[in-house]
């Protein structure tokens, strides 16, 4: 009997990450990443403009809509861009096969990027690929029509991506100066994509003490909606903390606060001199920004010999509620007991229904008399304070922080012989005459009455 024994093939299993540039802006972003010699990712560019496609540094190129546009571009029409992508669906699908994750980058507001990017994202999702969109919005000087086109494209794109990162070009003015060239400004926007891709690929290919697998990354980024990416590098004293601070404060992104994030991916990379305490300091600084106790925070740390003396921190925060605003603490003038107008604007205050205030629930104020004497008689510093769930106003801590309205309501509740609050629906309809004559800013916006 003859036995044929073969040695098992040495198959290397690793996730495949693809960066897919769409249109002129997407192709330029890919060119910048190739120039930067980014490792660990495949590149594909697709365009309706044959001339632009010819000048791309990328090897894998797709001419979108040969019959639809004849290589002449989409003419700033998203409808034409979408038709071109649909015509080239087989080529797009072929270029994405075997990919585990794809970053789709495009400029919103034009024809090819706005129209084709959602089609490409849909194909990627049909293939079961983790799909991340990183797109830009137009400058203000490009006009309202282009901005509306971009917004419509974003709505369409968001239906098909797991995670979406939006970079408004107008925010480039936050970091540019009078000497910044037009090309350099766009490169700054492309660096957001570069940092995000590098943060993921480093975790895959770089050696480290705490390695992550692709399943970890997918858990943080799958079906998460809006997101932010940031990276920071620093050297010298407190380099880890400074790098973390830079990573979580990206000036190019709107709503870049990590408050409310449902998933956070942290990658800390350094040379052989990176210490345990530095890794701990950087990771904890980022964790402080996340106020969601149920957030899925995944942490990895890798080594890069080229980063001797430097620590790099990359952050991807996903599932961010873009409508959530930071909590503001209104300063109270001790003399007038009012809120100066210049300390806030209406956008800081989120209006809350009175029924949602726990301290008022099911409590009757029918026979409560509000007088200054009752307030002075019953108020002490150590008494339990009235808790109002209003984002714009923090819980009062001392006399100087209490507006006259909140103080009077609290005093009235204290004056009710400390009875147990029974649950009844309450609506506060009237204020005393003194309060009517007080500054309107004494009254929280959600209870403010219109003056006659």
UniProtKB/Swiss-Prot annotation:
HAMAP family: FtsZ
Function: Essential cell division protein that forms a contractile ring structure (Z ring) at the future cell division site. The regulation of the ring assembly controls the timing and the location of cell division. One of the functions of the FtsZ ring is to recruit other cell division proteins to the septum to produce a new cell wall between the dividing cells. Binds GTP and shows GTPase activity.
Biological source species: Rickettsia typhi (strain ATCC VR-144 / Wilmington)
Keyword Cytoplasm: yes
Subcellular location: Cytoplasm
Gene, per the UniProt record: ftsZ
Similarity section: Belongs to the FtsZ family.
GO cellular component, one term: cytoplasm
PANTHER family in alphabetical order: CELL DIVISION PROTEIN FTSZ-RELATED, MITOCHONDRIAL DIVISION PROTEIN FSZA
Protein name: Cell division protein FtsZ
Xref: CDD domains: FtsZ_type1 (cd02201)
Pfam families xrefs: FtsZ_C, Tubulin
């Amino acid at each position: 009997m003859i036995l044929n024994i073969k040695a098992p093939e040495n198959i290397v299993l690793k996730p495949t990450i693809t960066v897919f540039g769409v249109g002129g802006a997407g192709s330029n972003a890919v060119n910048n990443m190739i120039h930067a010699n980014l490792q660990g990712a495949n590149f594909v560019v697709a365009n309706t403009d044959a001339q632009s496609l010819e000048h791309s540094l990328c090897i894998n190129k797709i001419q979108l809509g040969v019959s639809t546009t004849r290589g002449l571009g989409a003419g700033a029409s998203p409808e034409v861009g979408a038709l071109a992508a649909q015509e080239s669906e087989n080529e797009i699908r072929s270029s994405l096969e075997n990919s585990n994750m794809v970053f789709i980058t495009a400029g919103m507001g034009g024809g090819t990027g706005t129209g084709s990017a959602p089609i490409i994202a849909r194909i990627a999702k049909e293939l079961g690929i983790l799909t991340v969109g990183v797109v830009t919005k137009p400058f203000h000087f490009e006009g309202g029509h282009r901005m509306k086109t971009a917004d419509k494209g974003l709505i369409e794109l968001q239906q098909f991506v797991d995670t979406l990162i939006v970079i408004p070009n107008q925010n480039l003015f936050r970091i540019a100066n009078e000497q910044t060239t037009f090309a350099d400004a766009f490169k700054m926007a492309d660096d957001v994509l570069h940092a995000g891709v590098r943060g993921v690929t480093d975790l895959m290919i770089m050696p480290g003490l705490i390695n992550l697998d692709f399943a970890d990354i997918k858990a943080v980024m799958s079906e998460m909606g809006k997101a932010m990416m940031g990276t920071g590098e620093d050297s010298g004293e407190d380099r880890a903390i400074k790098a973390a601070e830079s990573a979580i404060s990206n000036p190019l992104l709107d709503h870049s606060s990590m408050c409310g994030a449902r998933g956070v991916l942290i990658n800390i990379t350094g040379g052989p001199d990176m210490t345990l305490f530095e890794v701990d300091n950087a990771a904890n600084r980022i964790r402080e920004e996340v106020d969601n106790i149920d957030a899925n925070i995944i942490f990895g740390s890798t080594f890069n010999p080229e980063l001797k003396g430097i620590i790099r921190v990359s952050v991807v925060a996903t599932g961010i509620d873009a409508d959530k605003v930071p909590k503001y603490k209104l300063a109270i003038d001790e003399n007038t007991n009012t809120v100066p107008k210049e300390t806030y604007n209406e956008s800081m205050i989120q209006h809350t229904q009175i029924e949602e205030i726990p301290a008022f629930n099911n409590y009757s104020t029918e026979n409560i008399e509000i007088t200054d004497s009752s307030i002075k008689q019953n108020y002490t510093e150590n008494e339990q304070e009235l808790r109002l769930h209003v984002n714009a106003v923090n819980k009062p801590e001392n006399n100087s922080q209490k507006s006259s309205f909140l103080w009077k309501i609290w005093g009235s509740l204290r004056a009710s012989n400390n009875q147990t609050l029974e649950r009844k629906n309450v609506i506060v309809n009237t204020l005393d005459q003194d309060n009517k004559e007080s500054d309107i800013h004494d009254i929280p916006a959600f209870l403010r009455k219109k003056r006659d």
